[in-house]
Every structure is written in C-alpha cells, then in structure tokens.
C-alpha cells in the first residue's frame, strides 16, 4: 500500500461545540455561562434550538421552513411542516469541495485485507446509476427496498440510491438466518431485494445464495433482485441482476442526476426493534428528523469535523458495526458533514482459531482514522486480551474514542487512557495525552443518543459526560418524579425530530404508544405533565450533570452491543422437539464480561447432555446469529411465569445480578412460585456467598 503523508491535527484545534456556541453568539446574540445553561435553553426553547441546527448546517431545501414545530405533543409532533429535504442531497453537497481537496468519501477493508477507496464523485455517480435503475424497475417514493448486505461500500451506495428517489430503505445483516430476516421483511413488503452471495467472518466464508433464494420465495412483493458478488460468485440466484451492472452507468443521465425533494417527514428507512414481545417492530424514521439529529450528534457532540475544513482537515471517522446494528446507519451519517468514513467488514477479534483483538486497531492505523468508535464490549475485550496499542501500527492520528452499545466500565476506560498516554510520547499528538472518550447511549428507536460526549467537559471514568442538546432527558423514580444522584428510568419529556414517524402498518399508533408511552402517559402524575418517552434504561444523573447508564430495564438481549429480542431466540430453541419451554437472560451490565444463560425445560425422560447442548446452540446459530449463542445451557423443571403466562425474564435477571428475591418478584402474581428456589440457588452459586440472593 502506498504510504500517505500524515497530517496530525494539533493545537489549536477548536472543538466543534465551541464553534457552534460562537456561531450562536454571533448570529443569535446568545451567550451561556455553562454547558448546563446551554442544555436548558435547548430543551426549553425547542423551536430556537432546532432551527439553529437547520441554519448552522445549511440544510439544502427549495422551500425553507416557515415554522419548526407545527405540533408539539408526543408522539404526534410535526416538525418543519411544509419543508422539503433529502438525506442524499446533504451528502452530495460535499462532492465538489471534498473532491477538490483530494479526499475520499469511503475507505473500506475486509478481513481478507481487500482495500478499497471510493471518491466522492464515484459515490454520487454509482448512487445515481443505481437510483436510475431502481426507477426503471418501477420504484416510486414510499416503495421499500430491502437489503441483505454486509458492511461494505455497496450497502452505502444502495442506501443513497434508494433515498435519492424517495424509496424506503431497510437492511438486515447476512449473519442473520432466513427466519429472522423474514420476520422483518415480510412486514414491510419490499419491492426490490438487494443481496449478496455470501460473507466472510472470523476466517470462514459463508455462502448465502440459498438464503437469498428462500427470501425471494417467501416475499411475494419482491419484483426485482439485485445480487452483489461479495465472495466472487459462489452461486447464482435465478433472474437476479448483477450489482456491478446496476452501478456501471456513466453518461449524461447520471451526470445530471440529483436526488428528489421529499417532505421533511417522508420515510427514509425502516429499522427494527429487538422483538422482545413478538415480531420485531418496524420503526420508520424520516429524512428531515434523521438529518438534524445526526448532524447535531456527530458534529457537535461527537466532535467529528468536515474532512476538507481547515479546523478538521483530513478527519477520518470509523465506527465498527455490522449491518444488523443501528450504528451502521450512524456510521454512514458521517458523510452528511463531508467526513471521510472508514468501514471494516469482518470480525474485529480475528479468526476463530487465532483470536487477534489488534485487528481493528491496525485497520485504524493503516487508514489514518482520527475518530475510532466501537461497542464498549470491543474495548473490554481488547483489555482482557492484553492488547498493546504500541504494537498495532501508527495510531498517531486518533484523537477520540467512541463507545456505545453497553456501559463502558471504569477499568476499561482507564486501560485505554493509559495506552494512549504511552503512545503520546512518540505520536506528537497532544490529544493522546488524555485521550477523549466520547461515550454515549441512545437507541435504534430514534437512531440517536440521549446522553453523550462534550469535548469541553471533564472526563470521569464510568460516566457519560452530559445530556445532549435538545434531549430533555430525566431519571424518573417509581412515582414519576425527576431525581438526581439516584438510579431511575431514563425518560425524555420533550419530542425529538428523529423519534419514529410511526411503526409500519401500525395505523392507529397503538404499538407505538404501548412501546414508549404506556408507563408515563399524558397527565400520568395528575399535574398535567406528559406524556414522557420511557426508553428502557436505568439512568443516574450526577450532581455535576454527568450520566451513568446501568443497563436495560427490560428483557432485551444486548449481546456485545447487538440487540435481539428474546422471542426470536425462543422460536429457534422451542422448535426443537426435545425442548418444552425456555428462558434466556442477558447479564451484560456495567461493563462486566457478557454472560447469557439459557434455561430449558425438556420433555419427560430427556436429560441435557453435551449433544443436546450442541443441538440447541446450533439452532440459535442457524436461525439468529453465532453472536447469540448462550454462555451456558441449564436444564430446569419450570420457567417462572406470571398468572397471565408471561415469562418473568426481568425479575430473574435482577435476581442473577444480586438483588434479593423479595425485592424483584411478587410471588402472589406468579403461576408457579415454587420454582423460584432453583433460581435462587443458581444466583447464589454464581454470585458467591459474598453477594447472597436470598
């Protein structure tokens, strides 16, 4: 690979939040004595704050917005009524300036070492070519385009092409089995399926042509299939068009192509809930809301600058993600601000028979990454594997580390800080002496973050620095009272532009309301307040404004930063003839090593042996993903259930985390309280005598 001259960003680099604050002073006459004062302004004057984001980022529109909030009430808030935007327009506005600076749009690599760079002009041309192909196939605004692709350049091109013509994008990762993908795509009835022939992961190739054929056969709405030869053509799919042919057009039509203007609330993409209480919920986000939320988050709070701007020249943004996680969407959002995105497709921990947690760091070194993000579990694994960053190449350009997906432990943060402090002695990058951790927490539900980073605030290991601008986040106690320095339910009391437009085929918003607003509906405390969005996380807001996330308050599996609903796992396990009932709990909590036990009730006369354990794990691996194989499988007599028959996942999770049984479960509300003794003993054995669950 040709060595490129490195330009390390050195002082006086101005934090992006400082640039925005100065702009507010210059254009709005606003001054703030502290970040807390700025945050309070942003959540009390929503119109002024979100209009400032529109203006600051120069959102292209043929029709500037007349008002910000036509309606303020959740979940029916109407943002920027009458305005027109297009997500892809915001990306492509950087083509000429970034190209003139000689900067690529995307740098990619897979675990086999294949390195590619895509220019901004090629990104637009190939997106235009595919967009025109989709239009020729009859794709109109509102039609769904479903993709079954890994984290590669072709996925980005497919997304921009779809968004450009008003199609609605939806993506599943190729490590998901047929059943899990159909649970999602059947609900949205896509017109086009864009898929790959296979993927490589952890040193092994996986042919996916059979899965693609099964998807096509089970999706009668699909009229057209496009197949990308990701493995070089390991197999064919009848009547599928080659992806390369759809992006090959280079003529007057592609040169003149421009994304079409769409209403602010036109659907951009459909992402999915974890499916804890049934089928995954198809969550619809709009062009405008995602534009505003993503720019504010990525630039102001993540401090990711424009690659061709003097203050952040050469910025390269990386956030490791599979296409089964909303962080793929957030990674792609880096292009909105003219930032070069660096993407990696493969296992960050190396091949199965030779684990190597330095893999992703070497990728970052060789591609010149400046912002390096991943799930918190990745950094914990690096620490446990004794990775020495000094042996991973030239990491001198990295000036920020991003984490999400699960809480980052103090121990892991201190490990990373010490590693970079040692690097700073030779890197010449002063930012590495006390590397900035941009820890954040949010959700697929609104494709953003509630709490996150601020380059100007102090860092306290184990804490997230602040509540984000525009996010009216509070911690509620059991009575719905806002509390500080106590653990409570994370709620948002004011609307955000990127909150779901609706769930697909949920015309009366019943599922939407029950998902977020059942706990704190309008006037929930008799004072006229509400409704408030309940997110499902435990949160403590510290007296200095910091935030600590204590994990999920519901039963969602959050496995190494990837979410999956328990119901999907049960479908796979309980389809086996030997299994009568099952329950799984995810104990990834406060940065501890992920531990997920699976409890199974077997048919009479059957005992759990190694062969049956392997069969159960194989069913999960095949139907869902290898990432959701449990740490252990345990035979039990009964699964705890409520009187109405619901599995009591959350109480058992709390029990296994060390809380007393009498505080986590009401035996009178149980159908089978006598079964709890076994789980208490299991918790006692796991926690040890020092933390007895009685």
Predicted ranges, named:
Residues 164-246, 375-376:
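Structural core segment of the AMP-binding/adenylate-forming
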Residues 116-121, 260-262, 268-292:
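Conserved AMP-binding A3 loop
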Residues 289-316, 323-370, 385-386:
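Conserved AMP-binding/adenylation subdomain of ANL enzymes
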Residues 224, 583-588, 597-599, 617-694:
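Conserved C-terminal "lid"/linker of ANL adenylate-forming enzymes
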Residues 192-211, 344-348, 367-415, 438-445, ...:
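Adenylate-forming
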Residues 133-176, 180-182, 300, 318-322, 399-401, 408-546, 553-556, ...:
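Conserved AMP-binding/adenylate-forming
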Residues 147, 170-198, 212, 353, ...:
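AMP-binding/adenylate-forming catalytic core of the ANL superfamily
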């Amino acid at each position: 690979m040709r060595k490129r001259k490195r330009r390390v960003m050195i002082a006086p680099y101005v934090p992006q939040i400082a640039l925005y604050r100065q702009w507010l002073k210059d254009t709005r006459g606003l001054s703030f004595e502290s970040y807390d004062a700025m945050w309070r302004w942003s959540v009390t004057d929503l119109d002024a704050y979100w209009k400032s984001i529109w203006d600051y980022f120069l959102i292209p529109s043929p029709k500037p917005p007349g008002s910000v909030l036509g309606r303020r009430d959740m979940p029916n808030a109407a943002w920027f009524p009458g305005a027109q935007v297009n997500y892809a327009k915001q990306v492509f506005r950087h083509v000429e300036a970034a190209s003139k600076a000689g900067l690529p749009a995307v740098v990619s690599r897979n675990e086999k070492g294949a390195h590619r760079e895509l220019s901004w002009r090629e990104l637009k041309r190939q997106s235009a070519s595919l967009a025109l192909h989709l239009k020729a196939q009859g794709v109109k605004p509102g039609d769904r385009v479903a993709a079954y692709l890994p984290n590669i350049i072709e996925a980005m091109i497919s997304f921009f092409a779809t968004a450009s013509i008003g199609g609605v994008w939806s993506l599943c990762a190729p490590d998901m089995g047929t059943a899990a993908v159909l649970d999602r795509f059947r609900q949205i009835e896509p017109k086009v399926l864009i898929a790959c022939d296979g993927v490589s992961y952890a040193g092994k190739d996986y042919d996916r042509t059979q899965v693609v054929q099964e998807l096509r056969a089970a999706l009668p709405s699909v009229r057209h299939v496009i197949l990308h030869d990701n493995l070089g053509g390991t197999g064919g799919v009848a009547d599928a068009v080659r992806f390369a042919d759809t992006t090959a057009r280079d003529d007057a039509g592609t040169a003149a192509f421009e994304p079409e203007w769409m209403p602010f609330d036109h659907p951009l993409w459909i992402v999915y809930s974890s499916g804890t209480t049934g089928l995954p919920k198809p969550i619809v986000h709009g062009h405008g809301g995602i534009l505003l939320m993503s720019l504010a988050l990525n630039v102001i709070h993540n401090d990711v600058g424009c690659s061709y701007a003097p203050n952040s020249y050469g910025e390269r943004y990386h956030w490791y993600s599979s296409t089964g996680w909303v962080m793929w969407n957030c990674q792609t959002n880096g292009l909105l601000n003219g930032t070069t995105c660096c993407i990696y497709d493969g296992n960050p921990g190396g091949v199965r028979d030779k684990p190597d947690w330095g893999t992703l760091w070497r990728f970052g070194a060789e591609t010149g990454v400046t912002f390096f993000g991943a799930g918190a579990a990745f950094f914990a694994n690096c620490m446990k594997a004794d990775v020495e960053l000094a042996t991973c190449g030239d990491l001198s350009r990295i000036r920020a580390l991003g984490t999400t997906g699960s809480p980052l432990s103090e121990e892991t943060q201190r490990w990373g800080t010490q590693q970079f402090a040692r690097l700073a002695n030779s890197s010449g990058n002063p930012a590495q002496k006390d590397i900035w951790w941009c820890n954040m927490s949010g959700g697929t539900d609104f494709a953003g973050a509630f709490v996150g980073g601020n380059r100007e605030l102090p860092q306290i290991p184990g804490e997230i620095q602040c509540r984000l601008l525009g996010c009216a986040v509070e911690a509620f106690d059991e009575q719905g009272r806002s509390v500080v320095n106590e653990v409570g339910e994370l709620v948002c009391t004011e609307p955000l532009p990127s909150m779901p437009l609706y769930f697909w085929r949920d015309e009366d918003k019943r599922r939407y309301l029950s998902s977020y607003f059942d706990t704190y509906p309008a006037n929930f405390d008799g004072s006229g307040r509400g409704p408030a969005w309940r997110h499902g996380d435990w949160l403590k807001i510290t007296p200095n404004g910091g935030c600590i996330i204590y994990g999920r308050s519901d039963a969602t599996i959050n496995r190494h930063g990837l979410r999956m609903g328990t119901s999907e796992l049960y479908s796979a396990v309980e389809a086996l003839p030997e299994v009568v009932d099952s329950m799984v709990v995810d104990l990834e909590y406060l940065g501890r090593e992920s531990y997920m036990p699976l409890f199974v009730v077997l048919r009479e006369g059957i005992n759990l042996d190694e062969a049956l354990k392997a069969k159960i794990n194989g069913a999960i691996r095949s139907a869902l993903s290898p990432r959701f194989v449990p740490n252990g499988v345990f035979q039990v007599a009964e699964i705890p259930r409520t009187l109405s028959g619901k599995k009591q996942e959350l109480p058992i999770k709390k029990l296994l985390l060390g809380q007393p049984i009498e505080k986590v479960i009401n035996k009178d509300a149980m159908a089978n309280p006598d079964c709890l003794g076994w789980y208490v003993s299991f918790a006692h054995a796991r926690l040890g005598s020092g933390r007895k669950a009685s």
